Design a protein with these regions (language model features):
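A cross-family phosphate/adenosyl-ligand binding-site feature
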Residues: 1-124, 129-407
Length: 407
């Protein structure tokens, strides 16, 4: 899946140890379909060689304004006019100061100042020591650069090359790729608040064991990412899964169906879209043993009693906000047979405008899927594809229905 096909990215490197991450970022951008032109400052070349970046980008690297390859000796004009975006990764504290002051003493800063601001965005991934990051001068400079139209991609936190720990690390290449992809995505849900549930629930029998299912949460996490790419403010309620939180998404971890219900009802009060992908346990033990249930040697298994869990989707769909059209509800049905019939019946039973069906055993834990969109007008299939691609298609469908008033 090439998310950046047709995009031409100027990747600018400034002086800092985080330049080693720029090599991987370059590779990921190209893998995502972009063409990459690397421009380096003299200081950046002390940390990683132009030869390395040329090998990865497949293009000659520019390091000087006086590059003889440009017939008009204006690489700052030529390169910026070809770009769909300039990405500074890493951007040092010194380079941020130059940008804030409009100083142009080498090629990369010249390009940033000479770029057509209405069509060539500037994306900045700062990287520096924690004290440099926290210094008022640095924060003042970055605020000025943002006020001048640049987009800040933020920083990471953790161990730094100097041996200290704190904020100021350059984001990881995969995180930057996610942010860059989101930047170019159509903002069809701008201003919307999207609530997503994902993963399984776990219903405890005792402190050791419980009832759960094979849901990996991948589809729900992909939907949360796609909604964020589309410009929404996203809250993700996740059952017990081991997946990284999508960039820019607020995550609430829960364990049981009752915990998920409580979180969903609370968060749905502020949402405009609710996508219920979680595979919630239908039943839970009527009682929970405080100690491990052990074999007693009789050969007879323990007698377990169950009670039905509340229906989270149906409960939210019956809320006043959902009934009066403020909240658009989308449900998921993971079935093992008769998918269309079960999906149609489930949509009507839960009283929702759109239900997405799939065959659970064929999708749990997989990176791809196929979906059926079921509404009052019938059924439409989304053929098998990566889950993120399907998530983007689903989010586009939801956005279209909202814009048409299809609540």
């Amino acid at each position: 899946m090439q998310d950046l096909t047709g995009k031409h990215i100027v990747l600018g490197l400034t002086g800092g140890i985080a330049c080693y991450k720029s090599a991987e970022l370059c590779r990921l951008l190209i893998k995502a379909g972009a063409t990459v032109q690397v421009v380096m400052t003299e200081a950046a070349a002390q940390f990683i060689t132009p030869v390395t970046m040329q090998a990865l980008s497949g293009r000659p690297v520019y390091t000087s304004q006086w590059d003889a390859r440009e017939p008009n000796t204006m690489p700052h004009i030529n390169l910026s006019r070809e770009a769909d975006a300039i990405v500074l990764a890493p951007c040092s504290a010194d380079f941020a100061a130059r940008l804030a002051q409009g100083r142009t003493d080498e090629l990369l800063s010249l390009m940033c100042l000479a770029r057509p601001m209405d069509r060539v965005p500037l994306l900045i991934a700062p990287a520096m020591n924690r004290e440099m990051w926290a210094h008022p001068a640095t924060q003042r400079n970055l605020q000025q650069v943002a006020a001048d139209g640049a987009t800040m991609l933020g920083v990471g936190s953790g161990w730094q090359a100097c041996g200290e720990t704190g904020d100021g690390r350059m984001l990881e290449p995969a995180q930057l790729l996610e942010d860059i992809t989101a930047f170019f995505s159509p903002k069809v849900l701008a201003g919307q608040q999207v609530l997503v549930t994902a993963g399984p629930t776990f219903e405890a029998l005792d402190p050791i064991r419980g009832i759960t299912n094979h849901s990996s949460g991948k589809m729900g996490f992909a939907i949360a990412r796609a909604a964020r790419e589309a410009g929404a403010e996203v809250t993700l309620i996740a059952g017990p899964v081991h997946l990284p939180t999508p960039r820019g998404v607020r995550r609430i971890d829960v364990l049981s169906a009752l915990e998920m219900l409580d979180a969903a009802q609370r968060e749905a009060q502020h949402a405009s879209v609710f996508v219920a992908t979680a595979a919630v346990a239908d039943w839970r033990p009527a009682s929970h043993s405080e100690q491990k249930i052990k074999k007693d040697g009789s050969g007879h298994p323990p007698v377990l009693h169950f009670v039905e869990n509340p229906d989270i989707l149906a409960t939210v769909a019956k809320s006043e906000r959902a009934r009066d059209g403020q909240l658009f509800c989308v449900g998921f049905a993971a079935e093992s047979e008769n998918l269309i019939a079960h999906a149609k019946a489930k949509r009507e039973r839960k009283g929702i405008p759109l239900l997405v069906g799939n065959i659970g055993p064929l999708t749990f834990g997989q990176d791809d899927n196929s979906l059926l969109l079921v509404d009052a007008d019938g059924v439409r299939e989304l053929p098998r594809a990566p889950k993120l691609q399907l998530a983007r298609e689903l989010i586009a469908e939801v956005a279209a229905r909202r814009s048409q008033g299809g609540l």
